[in-house]
Amino acid sequence: MRRRTSPRRTTTSKPQPIGPIQTFEVDGLTHEAKGVARLQGKVTFIEGALPGETVEAQVNKAGRRFDEAVLVNIIEPSVYRVEPSCQHFNLCGGCSFQHLANEQQLSAKADWLQGQLRNLITTQELETLSDTPTGYRRRARLAIDIKKGRMVLGFRGKASKEIISIDQCVVLTPNLQSTFLLLKLKLLENDLAGVLGHVELLEDTKGVSALFRLTSPISDELKNAWEDWAEKGRVALYWQAPKVGKAEVALEKMRYYDLGDLRLKYHPQDFIQVNAAMNQKMVVQAMDWLNPSKQDVILDLFCGVGNFSLPLAVHAQAVIGVEVQETMVEAARENARVNGFDNLSFVAADLTKPVNNELFKQTITKVLLDPPRAGAFEFLDSIIKIGPTQILYVSCNASTLARDAEYLVAKGYRVLRVSLMDMFPQTSHVETMMLLQKKK
């Protein structure tokens, strides 16, 4: 006998159903974790449905090429469907895969990544790097809203701008979860209502910090009261005033995190990887693949505060890091100094434009790049001109990685290894590492 269940639905801010309830056989999954079904030859995307399921759904957005539908009932569930570990999953927009078993999440991501890189790799070539699926996130940006005169702290909802008030987040580290609950209780006093834009919570080796981004100035009295709260809760508090790029430090200056035997300093607004365990594994894998030696001069593009640069410098003859953010370059130089490196140089440069620097005129044997989502297409010709024997590309956007890698292959490189890195379990996000070798 077929089982029938009724999933909890999301916010009413979504488009309302416009068609009758219909039965669908789901045979695929999109990168956004929507089930793919076909009815009378037309594709329908159903949020919350999984491959292999028979469901009832109601179209709420009709298009010329495809429809989108609301899941009403699950008639026959997938064997891989699991109960979400978070009570807010059906409302909160933070996670998209909690209803799918962890091993199948990886399988779905691998299928999607192979599709993106179909012109570059075969199915057998894709490796996987993963760690614990919950309690991993050491950084979170929390949204603020006012409802019925009270401040609401949470995340944006699924496919909506509504702020969902949450009581727990299973992907946050335990220390961030505890700080979140303390902060939520403190905000009930409403003394920051209308002036607090959002909050960033962050955990590192030094402890927990909170960055408050203000929409207008506050009094010294109010600021002191919050600093007292932070001190009691052992939270380092930072303020960012309106239209000021650099954080105004309330209690402490720079933060730091440990990476193996190395200690890296950074400012609280600087980019660092949110998954500490996966960052460690990623760096170890990068060292293994690139295999730096005392014969290597390595160029580290989009280097940040030196997350790859310093580990590379342990083994290489020299490492040159390039980063557009001046504050991160300053932090990277400080990291080289305090960790005792004299073979590290850092350059502040915009890699979307030609870079003229004496450091680039020496023989560079290998290149590592970790660009933003837009990729590094503008700088590829410069890399090709440098002529490194190997290029290690770390990507947070598989589509731009595919574009850039196909260009490099056309210019004389070949793909040696590719790894899916599950940096964000319970979400559809995919990180990728690719090693390319110059053809002889």
Curated annotation (Swiss-Prot):
Iron keyword on record: yes
Keywords on record: 4Fe-4S, Iron, Iron-sulfur, Metal-binding, Methyltransferase, rRNA processing, S-adenosyl-L-methionine, Transferase
SUPFAM superfamilies: Nucleic acid-binding proteins (SSF50249), S-adenosyl-L-methionine-dependent methyltransferases (SSF53335)
PROSITE patterns, sorted: SAM_MT_RNA_M5U, TRAM, TRMA_1, TRMA_2
Transmembrane segments: none
Stored InterPro entries: 23S_rRNA_MeTrfase_RlmD, MeTrfase_TrmA_AS, MeTrfase_TrmA_CS, NA-bd_OB-fold, SAM-dependent_MTases_sf, TRAM_dom, U5_MeTrfase_fam
Binding site for [4Fe-4S] cluster: 86, 92, 95, 169
Renumbered residue ranges of the record's region Disordered: 1-21
Positions annotated as active site in the UniProt record: 396 (nucleophile)
Residue stretches making up the TRAM domain: 15-73
Reactions it catalyzes: uridine(1939) in 23S rRNA + S-adenosyl-L-methionine = 5-methyluridine(1939) in 23S rRNA + S-adenosyl-L-homocysteine + H(+)
Entry binding sites for S-adenosyl-L-methionine: 273, 302, 307, 323, 350, 370
One of the GO BP terms on file: rRNA base methylation
Record flagged with keyword Metal-binding: yes
Function: Catalyzes the formation of 5-methyl-uridine at position 1939 (m5U1939) in 23S rRNA.
Stored NCBIfam families: PRK13168.1, rumA
Protein name, UniProt field: 23S rRNA (uracil(1939)-C(5))-methyltransferase RlmD
Organism: Marinomonas sp. (strain MWYL1)
